[in-house]
Swiss-Prot record:
It comes from the Bacteria. GO terms for biological process: 'de novo' IMP biosynthetic process; adenine biosynthetic process. Its main location: cytoplasm. This is Phosphoribosylformylglycinamidine cyclo-ligase. It is an enzyme of class 6 (ligase). InterPro entries: PurM-like_C_dom, PurM-like_C_sf, PurM-like_N, PurM-like_N_sf, PurM_cligase. One of its GO terms (cellular component) is cytosol. It comes from Shewanella denitrificans (strain OS217 / ATCC BAA-1090 / DSM 15013). Coiled coil: none annotated.
Amino acid sequence: MSTPTPLSYKDAGVDIDAGNALVNNIKSAVKRTHRPEVMGNLGGFGALCELPTKYKHPVLVSGTDGVGTKLRLAIDYKKHDTVGIDLVAMCVNDLIVQGAEPLFFLDYYATGKLDVDTATSVVNGIGEGCFQSGCALIGGETAEMPGMYEGEDYDLAGFCVGVVEKADIIDGTKVSAGDALIALASSGPHSNGYSLIRKVLEVSKADPQQDLNGKQLIEHLLEPTKIYVKSVLKLIEESDVHAMAHITGGGFWENIPRVLPANAKAVIDGASWQWPVVFDWLKTNGNISQHEMYRTFNCGVGMIIALPADKVDAALSLLEAAGEQAWLIGSIASREGEEEQVEIV
């Protein structure tokens, strides 16, 4: 009887050496995001972080999200360096809705076969997103799972924790009729609606590399999600923000009501901004109704902010000075009975 061939973890499809090489590659990206509250170094069993001392009654705010099927396009077109920014943006933009300053971020990268260069590119993007939002990339997990994912396909998840002063939590309770609504421009579809986007590409048989207003269509579609943290936190510090809505999955119809009292509705002037060309392309080539566009996509608006009408001019000036494209998009009105909480006129 012959002796069985000795087996290793690598024979089963898991390369520990590749994982170690990845950790070594991303050290500089992690170091760039360091905050003084972070204790210890990368690689511990748990990541430690103190609360900033400036808070008298700190409340932790947490969030988790992914990039969705935008990853399919990124993988197909070998554009891995910006999906990490998307991942961070989807989490930190949720946290600032409640007035929280992002503290730290963790990522989960799962793949069938670990390609060190691809994973390094992705995590460097995560580091860039953390740098833009001022939060520390404090840890993560890389899972090589042969048989669970096809080849070098991968999926991402992100987890973020922030902090806000208890007295300064923004929860929508101050919203009242007469408040103004300010919109912050998105950079494109951000990270939502990509299953429909891919369906439009399939049905229309469009070439993703075709020119669209001086840029390839695929470049419009893979534009990273805008991170609003620094500009919005500055606005919160200097103005009286009553509520904010991060326009993600569910678009206008689903996200705005999440931050409104039951007796309030948002009345939005649909002509107050111009849709970016990529949304017009999707609407036309997918024969998508106006209602479905607003239900699926951000249509050029990544964040909506409710604040007193007399604060609008100062808020717009501050946001534009911070690098945002911002405009007055509508107002809050009283809601009668079972009226819809979002009206686009």
